[in-house]
């Protein structure tokens, strides 16, 4: 079975996305986005689901970047789902594949 990591920064305005992953046995990261630890978690999973608010340059936790171009080399090796505003721009700019929103 593939190991799935969910990165969904805590934000009550995106709680409606929780049914996508809750109760499925996925590893969930909703707080504590230290870059080195997050990269290690990504490396140890086959699939990465990224949810929340974002912009052209990646996924945000309020105004702080959580996923940005420094993660691209790791993400290219994974099955990806990106659900945030402008996820398509981020995926396209970095040659990432997978399901993503516009």
Question: What function would you assign to each model-found segment?
Answer:
Residues 1-49, 81-82, 87:
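A domain-level signal for caspase-like cysteine endopeptidase catalytic cores
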